[in-house]
Amino acid sequence: MTKNKKIIFVFIVLIFILLMLFIAKTRRENKIEYPEFETNGQSIYLPTYIPDGYSVKSVRVSDGMTTAEFTDGSEVICFVEIRSTDVSIDIDDEDYETKKAELGSKYGFLSEWDDRKIFTYTDEISTVSISGKLKNKEIEKIVKSIKLYS
């Protein structure tokens, strides 16, 4: 094998290793195993990522609204998707701090009190709310992971 062929071979092996690492990381992040539930014929969106230690507590689908709860045994993360863009968002500044925020490439409102947060945004098809004892980075990961459930 010539020197150039060895360099090309090593380069291809490195690319292959990086690709395998990327695939392994992607599979770890898409780890939610949802129990079987009735979608009532609706197209619904759910996160494919939740923080480590959490599992699905419940999923409910009814008349244009999907609610999923995740728990780690003591804390709960709540995901709500309402299939409407005409939902008004009530901002209560007296009980907790609320500000405009961009998380996971979505613009919305982030409310904080103690160590709990609620991030609510509206996109082209729905209004989504994610709440729980979460850091902003975790909310971003959840937002970016929301996909059509199939």
Per-range role (PLM):
Residues 75, 125-127:
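Coil-to-beta-strand transition motifs
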Residues 127-150:
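Surface-exposed amphipathic alpha-helical segments
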Residues 1-7:
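Positively charged n-region of N-terminal signal peptides that target proteins for export
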Residues 119-124:
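Short, flexible turn/loop "capping" segments at secondary-structure junctions
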Residues 9-23:
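Hydrophobic membrane-insertion alpha-helices, especially the h-region
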Residues 25-118:
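Short, solvent-exposed recognition patches
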